[in-house]
Amino acid sequence: LNTAFTAGSSEGATILVVEAKHKLLSGGVQFNNTQSEELGRQLGILQTTINSPIGFGESLTMFGLARPTIKGMKGTGNDVSIRGGGLSFSYPLGDNGLKASLSYSESMTRPGGDIASLGIESNMKSGSLGLTYPLRLRADSTWSLRGTINWIDEIQQTNASGIDTDISHDRLTSLRLGLTYFGCPRGCIYFDTELSRGLDIASRSASEATTGTPLSRTSGTSHYHHLRLNSSYSFYALMDYLIKIGFGGQYTNDGLLNSEQSTIIGMDKISALTSGAISGDKIWYIRGELSRNFSIFKNLTISPYLYSAMGVAYTNKPTAAESKENAAKSAGLGVNINNFNDYFYFDKNITAKVEYSKTIATDKIEILSDVRLNKHHLMLFLNMSF
């Protein structure tokens, strides 16, 4: 993208000229070790987007995920602990920013390790249809509104007896309305809030489960409401130090099925525990981070950081086997590395993150679910986008 100014036709007028090159293909390759020990620790994700091949602003994105080993990508049976893939398509409706999107994905998890003998397997299919509209687009702030209809079908089964037997079966249809803001009036503010409601259409109710395969939670319902929020505020202190504070959560009075529960674990939440280690119907989390950028070469920067995070997840209407409340807090240090280059004749941005943390969690969850690399408490994240 290149810009320049040229003289206008009227006296004193100026015309902004923008020259851009169309990028037909874009995408990325990602690796991290945020999965549980039972799922093999490592996860690889490959994504490719075809940008406006016809010329109407449409895009088609395809992705796949698996454990990044030969057996993980090509194997079968117990060699495959996690695998998934999907595609999404978006198309602009008119010239006012309204955009329609359609997506579909499938995933499978087959935990190994100490519970491999149970033969547990989970298969999920999901799809969505949505509209997004920019309420306000300015150089210093953006507001966007979205509405989506989501559908999820998840079956958990076991073959411990030698025969595939369903343990639970959830099928949910949800209507979601979301609002997103990003702006930098003084510091930068981001928040995304979403209201969800369960619908009867194509959903599986508790009454259906009484005569067949049960739901994932006996107290869970497909008729629910919940409000979800993720936000952050970042600003510079003493000129060179960036402070970022993240806060969010989910609120509901209903007992939710597994797929609608939220988690306090994530890169911008508590990053020291494996994905999905702590989830609940109601949650809250807060994370603070202090970092500083150092430019090593022209296109290479490193950003050491310190962080502290905590969160709590609550279960509504818990059974005797469920925990009513789980909490965790962690503190650690890490470094982000960012490099842009055009080696091998294509532009790409390579980022990496290494993080060491100390975690304290309810019921010794940190012993079972902390992120590890080569038996050491280290989180590793690698990404190349092109």
Regions found by a protein language model. Give the residues of each.
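Transmembrane beta-barrel strands of outer-membrane/channel proteins
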Residues: F5, V29-N33, L60-A66, L102-E106, ...
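Residues that define the transmembrane beta-barrel architecture of outer-membrane proteins
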Residues: G12, G40-G44, S81-G85, N123-G127, ...
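C-terminal transmembrane beta-barrel domains of outer membrane proteins
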Residues: T213-F386
